Amino acid sequence: MAAGGDHGSPDSYRSPLASRYASPEMCFVFSDRYKFRTWRQLWLWLAEAEQTLGLPITDEQIQEMKSNLENIDFKMAAEEEKRLRHDVMAHVHTFGHCCPKAAGIIHLGATSCYVGDNTDLIILRNALDLLLPKLARVISRLADFAKERASLPTLGFTHFQPAQLTTVGKRCCLWIQDLCMDLQNLKRVRDDLRFRGVKGTTGTQASFLQLFEGDDHKVEQLDKMVTEKAGFKRAFIITGQTYTRKVDIEVLSVLASLGASVHKICTDIRLLANLKEMEEPFEKQQIGSSAMPYKRNPMRSERCCSLARHLMTLVMDPLQTASVQWFERTLDDSANRRICLAEAFLTADTILNTLQNISEGLVVYPKVIERRIRQELPFMATENIIMAMVKAGGSRQDCHEKIRVLSQQAASVVKQEGGDNDLIERIQVDAYFSPIHSQLDHLLDPSSFTGRASQQVQRFLEEEVYPLLKPYESVMKVKAELCL
């Protein structure tokens, strides 16, 4: 049975990233139509530049190519590739079939990587351009969430054990800070992308030097003109047959890092959902379990974690691919890159769409948070109580021993009897502590235990987050809708 299948058929496997999760716009960027249309555009740009620099290419040939950029006979191309065992030459023939007058000058002087690699770089750039505003929107939604809850005390956790208090907004800023680093890295790697350009079979530009009869300047002009037509500021000066596969490492490393950030955020949300302090959106008709109707599973956060793990592992592909590119190139890269580049971007696209949807509907339960604080705060307040007693004339050592005994009794009630923490009640009825009984409410005010959390939130948002989001103001209103 021949390899390949009808990918629109229910009898043929289709990647869930495309069929179930990723956005239509990201799927289109990695589609065959987008790819092969870009090949034709690159052939047109090459012909236009070659004509401008004096090669015998007519206006009629150029116009014929322009008129057929979208006229792609995919069936013919597939048949040609089956016959020739070469995808680029299959599309040269297919393009030439609908451009008979231009057929002889299509791909003039070029090698397969002229269309293959340059198209990949265009796709990487455009895919990054799709991700950047999506990530900015996630940051914006979380920034709104953090600002609104900047002063809401909550129990902090280290080692997932109760620690000092923080605020809900401050905790959210930990998430935002990681995503801001990801946004900066995505922008950097996007701006650092260079075009492969017009380089020939081993990167020496020998074929173009021959076409222009040894004119170095025209060869350099050709490279520059096509690079500018493709919208790049610069091209690699040095290439082998391909652009260095280190570029793929750079791009997928940034995406993998984004995956790590999203995994951490969504894990926190899942843990908070278990504590009943916070939940992701839950639709009115949504079913959490087929057997347990009360369940409210954090399905979206779980999906993000599941896909983020996949995204983090994909960076190993370009690392290994770059390491086995012998001399000017081997074909070890080809099949692998067809999979890992598309999957990385479709996965990143999915987790950003999902995280935006989550961040637009996060639900906080202040009463649950308050109750958990009441359970733990008495123990945390013991040092403040000791200091207040010393100020009232008591002995630190005597007070410490009193607190120690009462704390152990209260802990026994919590752990052995399943009761509430009654340390404060014990202190309130103990005559030894009568000098500070009137101060206990103040000493137990949760806001006095959150330090500068709310001020940190305000400063972080104003100095770091809002300036970073400013270039994306025009796209901030787009909502994230999930079908599944």
UniProtKB/Swiss-Prot annotation:
Pfam families documented for this protein: ADSL_C (PF10397), Lyase_1 (PF00206)
Residue sites binding substrate per the record: R20, Y21, R85, H86, D87, T111, S112, Q241, R303, R329, S334, R338
Effect of T450S: In ADSLD; moderate
Pathway(s) this gene product operates in, as recorded in its UniProt entry: Purine metabolism; AMP biosynthesis via de novo pathway; AMP from IMP: step 2/2; Purine metabolism; IMP biosynthesis via de novo pathway; 5-amino-1-(5-phospho-D-ribosyl)imidazole-4-carboxamide from 5-amino-1-(5-phospho-D-ribosyl)imidazole-4-carboxylate: step 2/2
Regulation: The enzyme reaction kinetics indicate cooperativity between subunits.
PANTHER family: ADENYLOSUCCINATE LYASE (PTHR43172:SF1)
Protein name: Adenylosuccinate lyase
